[in-house]
């Protein structure tokens, strides 16, 4: 089940405690000393060719659905004869998906910078397998906000499966009391436009790939 459907099923209005997840011990405190952002993304890779947005074979970054999709495409491509028709097709799909992922991340960064997080934007967006929710009590709110962003703005391409990493990013915004402001700016910068093809900024010639969750 894709993350979008999972979020829908989780964001019910029942009064039970089924959605409350047990608190897990933090491997890295989210707030440390006088700098509330210093520990966000403690394993942040600043080299674009090594981070989770372009190189999925880093073992820290193959657990999320979209990382596995990209990783599997690369594995299949590498099994083909280089420069063959199938190899070129897969290579183009890999390039397209990477560009889409980079553009989505850039959209989030632009909004964070507009909120005043110029120095903290990259670390706020950094997610690895060591990342955890800051507070299990925020889980429901983070799910609802992520769905709201997906359904009421165009910050994500319409046919793009929601990424688990952005649930953690939204959780961080909630911890900083910046989630609602983030949504307001996202609505202004990337308003929902019915009928507009799901092409990302700067990639008007690239086709949108309906990558399903594995």
Curated annotation (Swiss-Prot):
Disruption phenotype: Dilute mice carry a hypomorphic allele of Myo5a, resulting in melanosome clustering in the center of the cell. This causes decreased light absorption and an apparent dilution of coat color. The hair color of mice that are deficient for both Myo5a and Mreg appears nearly normal, but the abnormal clustering of the melanosomes persists. Likewise, mice deficient for Rab27a or Mreg have a gray coat, while mice deficient for Mreg and Rab27a, or Mreg and Mlph, have a hair coat that appears nearly black. One of its GO terms (molecular function) is phosphatidylinositol binding. Belongs to the melanoregulin family. Probably functions as a cargo-recognition protein that couples cytoplasmic vesicles to the transport machinery. Plays a role in hair pigmentation, a process that involves shedding of melanosome-containing vesicles from melanocytes, followed by phagocytosis of the melanosome-containing vesicles by keratinocytes. Functions on melanosomes as receptor for RILP and the complex formed by RILP and DCTN1, and thereby contributes to retrograde melanosome transport from the cell periphery to the center. Palmitoylated. Palmitoylation is required to maintain the protein at the melanosome membrane. One of its GO terms (cellular component) is protein-containing complex. Identified in a complex with RILP and DCTN1; interacts directly with RILP, but does not interact directly with DCTN1. Interacts with PRPH2. It comes from the Eukaryota. Its main location: membrane. This is Melanoregulin. Changing residue 18 to S: Loss of location at the melanosome membrane. It is found in: Apical cell membrane; Melanosome membrane; Lysosome membrane; Cytoplasmic vesicle membrane.
């Amino acid at each position: 089940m894709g993350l979008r459907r999972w979020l829908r099923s989780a964001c019910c209005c029942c009064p039970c405690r089924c959605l409350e997840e047990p608190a897990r011990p933090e491997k890295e405190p989210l707030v440390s000393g006088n700098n509330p952002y210093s520990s966000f993304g403690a394993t942040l890779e600043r080299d674009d060719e090594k981070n989770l947005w372009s190189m999925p074979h880093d073992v820290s970054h193959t657990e999320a659905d979209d990382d596995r999709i990209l990783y599997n495409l690369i594995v299949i491509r590498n099994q083909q004869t280089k420069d063959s028709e199938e190899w070129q097709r897969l290579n183009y799909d890999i390039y397209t998906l990477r560009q889409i992922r980079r553009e989505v991340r850039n959209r989030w960064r632009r909004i964070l910078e507009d909120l005043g997080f110029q120095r903290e934007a990259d670390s706020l967006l950094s997610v690895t397998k060591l990342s955890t929710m800051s507070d299990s009590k925020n889980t429901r709110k983070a799910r609802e906000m992520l769905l709201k962003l997906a359904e009421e703005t165009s910050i994500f391409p319409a046919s793009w499966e929601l990424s688990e990493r952005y649930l953690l990013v939204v959780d961080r915004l909630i911890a900083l009391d910046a989630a609602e402001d983030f949504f307001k700016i996202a609505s202004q910068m990337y308003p929902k436009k019915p009928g507009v093809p799901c092409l990302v900024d700067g990639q008007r010639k690239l086709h949108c790939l309906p990558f399903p969750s594995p």
